[in-house]
C-alpha cells in the first residue's frame, strides 16, 4: 500500500505531465494560427491575417503562463516535439470553421486538465 506522501508524489507528477502536454498543445495551436495568418495574408485577407496573428500571440501567452506555473512550483516546463501544421487552409470560411473546431478541441483539453 502506498503512503500518503507517495500518493501525493504520483498525483503531482501526473499533474505536471498533463500541464506540459497542454503547453505543447498551446504551442502547436500558436504555430497553426501563424500558418493560417500567413496563408490569409497571401490570399489578400489582411484583416483576417491580423486577427489570426493575435490568436498566435494569445496561444503563446497561454503556453508561457502554464510554463510559469510549473516552474514556480519547482517543476520542469517543456515543449515536446510539435507536429507539423498544415499550410493550405481553403476559403476564409473553411479557415474559420477549422479555427472553431480547433478551439472546441483545446477547450475540451483544458476542461479535462482542470
What residue ranges belong to the model's regions?
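Residue-level recognition of alpha-helical structural elements
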Residues: 15, 45-48, 92
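Disorder-to-helix initiation segments
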Residues: 3-22
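Mixed-charge, polar/low-complexity N-terminal
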Residues: 4-5, 9, 27, 38, ...
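Conserved alpha-helical segments that form or flank metal/cofactor-binding pockets of metalloenzymes
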Residues: 36-81
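Generic cytosolic/nucleocytoplasmic N-terminal low-complexity/intrinsically disordered segments
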Residues: 3-4, 75, 111
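Juxtamembrane/interface segments of multi-pass membrane proteins
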Residues: 11, 43, 85-88
Amino acid at each position: 500500500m502506498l503512503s500518503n506522501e507517495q500518493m501525493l508524489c504520483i498525483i503531482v507528477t501526473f499533474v505536471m505531465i498533463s500541464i506540459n502536454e497542454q503547453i505543447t498543445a498551446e504551442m502547436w495551436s500558436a504555430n497553426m494560427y501563424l500558418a493560417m495568418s500567413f496563408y490569409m495574408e497571401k490570399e489578400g485577407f489582411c484583416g483576417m491575417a491580423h486577427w489570426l496573428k493575435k490568436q498566435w500571440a494569445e496561444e503563446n501567452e497561454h503556453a508561457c503562463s502554464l510554463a510559469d506555473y510549473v516552474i514556480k512550483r519547482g517543476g520542469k516546463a517543456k515543449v515536446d516535439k510539435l507536429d507539423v501544421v498544415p499550410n493550405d487552409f481553403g476559403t476564409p470560411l473553411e479557415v474559420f470553421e477549422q479555427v472553431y473546431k480547433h478551439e472546441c478541441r483545446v477547450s475540451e483539453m483544458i476542461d479535462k486538465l482542470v
